[in-house]
Amino acid sequence: MARYTGPVCKLCRREGIKLFLKGDRCYTDKCAIARRNYAPGQHGHTRKKPTEYALQLREKQKAKRIYGVLEAQFRRYFEMAERQPGITGENLLVILERRLDNVVYRLGLAESRAQARQLVRHNFFTVNGRKVNIPSYLVKVGDVIALKEEKKDSPIAKEIMERAASKTLPAWLSYDANNAVGKVEALPKREDIDIPVEEHLIVELYSR
């Protein structure tokens, strides 16, 4: 299955909730779901009571779209979460939060996860001093994520450094604005993860 390349605002309208896929635009009146709060397509205005399966599927689709993950990889993350001690749904969200593209976004070094994914692929960052250009790389406690020195003079780097300096960080990350360096201080807890997903429904879906 190929990665979705169509209008991302349609994805928010499909889920009936803001997924914050376009960065700052999602916080303005230009957000599509603020203007057209119904599903896209000919039958978008039709409201039917969803089945239990439909509710479970929608939660999975929301999580996949928020983090930009395709089905095969999402399934692997779920299997990883199942093998770990604790609550499977929470384990799954923690794994998704540990993706390098998500951490770059959480640090404020990208406007959206999609932009973070692109910047990682274009070698803008190092992890513990080593080049990492794999968006799905899973960070660990103690990992240091830094903007490459040779990239700091580029217009986009200056823009993201300015944005990151005023970003409110989750409790599990720290950021040195003077050097554009972030650190994973701890693994996130469920209360640190502010995404509109009911993860227990995803667990129920994969347990069918």
Swiss-Prot record:
Pfam families: Ribosomal_S4, S4. Keywords: Ribonucleoprotein, Ribosomal protein, RNA-binding, rRNA-binding. One of its GO terms (biological process) is translation. GO terms for molecular function: rRNA binding; structural constituent of ribosome. The keyword Secreted does not apply. It comes from the Bacteria. InterPro entries: Ribosomal_uS4, Ribosomal_uS4_bac-type, Ribosomal_uS4_CS, Ribosomal_uS4_N, S4_RNA-bd, S4_RNA-bd_sf. Residues 98-161 form the S4 RNA-binding domain. GO terms for cellular component: small ribosomal subunit. One of the primary rRNA binding proteins, it binds directly to 16S rRNA where it nucleates assembly of the body of the 30S subunit. HAMAP family: Ribosomal_uS4_B. Belongs to the universal ribosomal protein uS4 family. This is Small ribosomal subunit protein uS4. The lineage of its organism: Bacteria, Bacillati, Bacillota, Clostridia, Thermoanaerobacterales. The gene is rpsD.
